[in-house]
């Protein structure tokens, strides 16, 4: 019967807002403070890596560990957290009828969530089947008399089923929720916008949400006034996409928290003292508007969503706080008990780490001692060995250059601060994802010095030679020859995930959100391009295998980056 009922989604949301408004609070300043802490101290190169891992067809225990480690880093940097709390509901503020309804709803919600998040059943293969393969598999199973292919997992928008292949699936719990502070920080850092611009844009989105659920058309109109909103991807699923995504739902949640004095459910705060009052108010609205828990797998309706979040942790902000440290699910942490009272245990909150300050030095060229040291270092380059070269940026304004010799494992990798900031921002959005602020401390003059010290008449291998040829010619190195392997884009990037998994730690500045333009104005999120890792994957693609050996940097870090000292106020 529940399936035949109509979910009046926004009407339910408004009704719950009105009834629970007294438990809501203004959280804007706290969220902005947490966002600033994340901007100052979170490793956004690892954020970019996690976003890449979440696009993989199949993710394993190693990927999950990286996600959990980054989630823990976020937890340590923010103040808005949910604390582990065992909620035991008894007759008192809640009647026995209330408790029976809550117990039934939690049980029904448990069944729905388990079917949605873990759709596999006995005999269903949870692998990387494309949409076409799934259809063929269904026909074959029907032909031999097995008709349970309908239980196969649903493919994503690109036709590929994405699954977690992990030993302990309980470790996935509470690792995927979005947080407004994290959404603000990622939009600012990876979109390369001022935090204030992000706040203003999400405030407008929140104002729309006060009257209706924002959709793609609303977002498109708002983007005209707030370009930062172009980073939002309306095609993103809301299930198992991690808190580092740019989905519309994540942005709407953040926008709701930017409204001062509102009664938005997102700003609800639950404590052990008001938990039963909140649940009683929820049941009152449920009865008045005939709300229910649906048996159909998929996204939760407003009542289901609120019930799950409130019962997951009875101490904190159920919608917006970091809950990565929580264990169990809503039905584990909130139970109905008609027995005598018992003491409730409560874990202590972890203290947030303080963001480290940073300072900027003034740029200077290579000193004589640096030039002499560079000459000695460049002597390690084998003039006769196969050598890959790749650059990011424009030939006349490169921002990253890498050389790699597969035979010895030696590589040269350095950066350059751009002169055309406007063009750099465009290239960052559609190619390399570098934040210009991360290039302020690179060593100036290194590009010309390294190119000048390359052995004469050297042969370099590349994927696309036009920009590289122009760069070499501009530095007077017309003697250097180029071999362009001319692979297709898909061929060249065949081993992209393997290379990033193994060597992603070598480069930490590709932190931005990068998209690729598609037909009819569409766009697709892609992994940022890194000159060094591109060289490694081009070598793997050209040989047809990825056989990672040991690699070593020719240039030490203090040659690539200038020393930075903090100024002391006198």
Swiss-Prot record:
A Gene Ontology biological process annotation? RNA-templated viral transcription
**Annotated GO CC locations:** helical viral capsid; host cell cytoplasm; ribonucleoprotein complex; viral nucleocapsid
Lineage, top-rank taxon, reads Viruses
Chain positions covered by the region annotation Disordered: 342-361
> What compartments host this protein?
Virion; Host cytoplasm
**Disulfide pattern:** none
The annotated region (Binding site for the cap structure m7GTP) lies at 54-241
Q: In the UniProt entry, what is the domain comment?
A: The N-terminal region is important for the cap-binding activity while the C-terminal region contains the 3'-5' exoribonuclease activity. A CCHE zinc binding site is present in the C-terminal region and may thus contribute to the substrate binding and/or the specificity of the exonuclease activity.
Q: What is this protein called?
A: Nucleoprotein
Origin species: Ippy mammarenavirus (isolate Rat/Central African Republic/Dak An B 188 d/1970) (IPPYV)
């Amino acid at each position: 019967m529940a399936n035949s009922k109509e979910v009046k989604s926004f009407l339910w949301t408004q009704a719950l807002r009105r009834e629970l408004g007294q438990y809501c609070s203004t959280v804007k300043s706290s969220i902005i403070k947490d966002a600033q802490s994340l901007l100052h101290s979170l490793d956004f190169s690892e954020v970019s890596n996690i976003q890449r891992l979440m696009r993989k067809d199949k993710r394993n225990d190693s990927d999950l560990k990286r996600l959990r480690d980054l989630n823990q880093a976020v937890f340590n940097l923010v103040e808005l957290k949910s604390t582990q709390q065992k909620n035991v509901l008894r007759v008192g503020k809640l009647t026995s009828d209330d408790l029976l309804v809550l117990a039934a709803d939690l049980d029904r919600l448990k069944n729905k969530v388990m079917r949605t998040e873990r759709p596999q059943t006995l005999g269903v293969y949870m692998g990387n089947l494309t949409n076409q393969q799934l259809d063929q598999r269904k026909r074959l199973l029907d032909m031999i008399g097995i008709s349970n292919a309908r239980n196969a997992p649903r493919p994503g928008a690109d036709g590929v089923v994405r699954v977690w292949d992990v030993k302990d699936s309980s470790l996935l719990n509470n690792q995927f929720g979005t947080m407004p502070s994290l959404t603000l920080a990622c939009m600012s850092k990876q979109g390369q916008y001022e935090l204030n611009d992000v706040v203003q844009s999400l405030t407008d989105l929140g104002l729309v949400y006060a009257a209706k659920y924002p959709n793609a058309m609303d977002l498109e109109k708002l983007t005209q006034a707030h370009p930062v909103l172009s980073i939002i991807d309306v095609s993103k699923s809301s299930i198992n996409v991690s808190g580092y995504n740019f989905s519309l739902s994540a942005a709407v949640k953040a926008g709701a928290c930017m409204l001062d004095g509102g009664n938005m459910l997102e700003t609800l705060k639950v404590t052990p003292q008001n938990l039963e009052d909140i649940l009683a108010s929820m049941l009152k609205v449920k009865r008045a508007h005939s709300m229910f828990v649906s048996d159909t797998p998929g996204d939760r309706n407003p009542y289901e969503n609120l019930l799950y979040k409130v019962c997951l942790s009875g101490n904190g902000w159920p919608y917006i706080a970091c809950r990565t440290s929580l264990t169990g699910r809503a039905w584990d942490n909130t139970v109905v008990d008609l027995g005598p009272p018992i003491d409730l245990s409560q874990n202590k909150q972890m203290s947030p780490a303080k963001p480290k300050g940073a300072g900027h030095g003034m740029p200077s060229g290579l000193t004589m001692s640096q030039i002499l040291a560079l000459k000695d270092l460049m002597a390690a380059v084998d003039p006769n060995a196969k050598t890959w070269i790749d650059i990011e940026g424009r030939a006349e304004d490169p921002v990253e250059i890498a050389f790699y010799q597969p035979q010895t494992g030696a590589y040269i990798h350095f950066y350059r601060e751009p002169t055309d900031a406007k063009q750099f921002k465009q290239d960052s959005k559609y190619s390399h994802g570098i934040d210009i602020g991360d290039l302020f401390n690179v060593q100036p003059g290194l590009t010309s010095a390294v190119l000048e010290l390359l052995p004469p008449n050297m042969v370099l291998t590349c994927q696309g030679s036009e920009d590289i040829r122009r760069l070499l010619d501009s530095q007077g190195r017309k003697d250097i020859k180029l071999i362009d392997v001319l692979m297709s884009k898909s061929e060249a990037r065949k081993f992209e995930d393997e290379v990033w998994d193994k060597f992603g730690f070598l480069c930490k500045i590709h932190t931005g959100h990068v998209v690729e333009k598609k037909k009819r104005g569409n766009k697709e999120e892609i992994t940022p391009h890194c000159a060094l890792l591109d060289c490694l994957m081009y070598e793997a693609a050209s040989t047809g295998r990825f056989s990672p050996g040991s690699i070593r940097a020719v240039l030490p870090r203090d040659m690539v980056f200038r020393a930075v000292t903090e100024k002391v106020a006198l």
